[in-house]
Amino acid sequence: MKRTLFALAAILALPLAAGGCSDLMDESTAADNSAALGDALAGTNATQFAAARANFALTEVQGDGLGPIFNERSCGACHANGALGGQGQQIERRYGTLTNGVFNGLANTGGSLRQLFGIGGFNPSPGVNCQSGTDANPAPGATIFAGRGTTPTFGLGLVERIPDGTIQGIAAAQPASIRGVAVTNQIHLSDGQFTRGQTHVSRFGWKNVHASLADFAGDAYLNEMGITTTSCAAGAVVRDFATENRANRAGTNAVINGCPDDMVPGVDDDFAAEENNCAGGLTEVQDDVANFAFFMRNLAPAPRGIDNSNGRGLTEFNREGCNGCHVTTTFTVSQNGRSFSFQPFSDFLVHDMGALGDGIGNDGDSVAVTRRMRTQPLWGIRFRNGLLHDYRTSDKATAISQHAGQGAAAASAFASATAAQRNDLLLFLSSL
């Protein structure tokens, strides 16, 4: 349902800044040792962070725009393990099929995301009865089903500030066995909905869909809570998060009847007013998405633990080729007027993971493209109880062994390692 947003430019704008990477830590703050789990980065405004944190944990209700179909009622409901902002227990459900050899997300039945809950009859205004209807499970026509766990958000503000060129340079340096034939296969450029006109290298989400945390938040607000939003980004109207999701069922009734959204300029009076305000450049109105983005942007990375392998695990990590995608690069960026160094152990690129890929993509994607998954950062893995994109295991050895496609060589190296070598590697991972 509708929630009107006018993006606060200073908060929502993608804060990419000068930075880079190095093999050794410099004199900047080691971001992953400077705070406890769930704390803010050094230099963060404490009052703003507390307000944003409260908004992230706030339970939405119908009057806030919740629904009519949704998966949870707050950001914190899906991001709370260890501390607010962490991994969640929920597994998002995706589906689709292949039509003439390419992916079809079955948009006519609300695909490719299935929302688990619906508001049966909500009256948002006099004379309007919003009916979400009953979902069909599985959705008609679906032949591909996948689960995706909710990812932790610790340290993502630092990731947002990694320069595009740094990620592109990592991609260019990787061998074809890891990146495929073309570097362009790995990199997705996003012109964000809340940062219109700023095209950057995407780095968030299992499929690397978003480059900015504002878009990451706006996407979740719509697809996980059913709260539609519009934005005034650089004075332009952005409508991509302004359309209600369809219920996951077939036929003309799949359209959510009577549920107002912001998608029809000149017909929806509220939308027309928003369009006029956007033309006037109204950007200084606080909104939920800005708070969500501020909270994630200023969360410190998960603190590192003690490496009980005495350094042997990192050596084994590199020997087995894990560092091909989970790069050991130390990135250095500026935030809150300070310089931070951090090791997320990810190249923030997508790779063809073969049988491990979830098979979900955009309409028209080839099967190979649907197998591409973003390299999940390993920092904070010691706080997670679900591994791989669908949380199929909590066992690190099993997760390594399940790597396929462009990760198969590392899985093979792990399988052929001695018991002592494997133990050293697992001890190292348990320190991250």
Question: Can you say where each PLM-predicted feature lies in the sequence?
Answer:
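Bacterial N-terminal signal peptides that target proteins for export
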Residues: 1-8
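Periplasmic c-type cytochrome electron-transfer domains
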Residues: 21-432
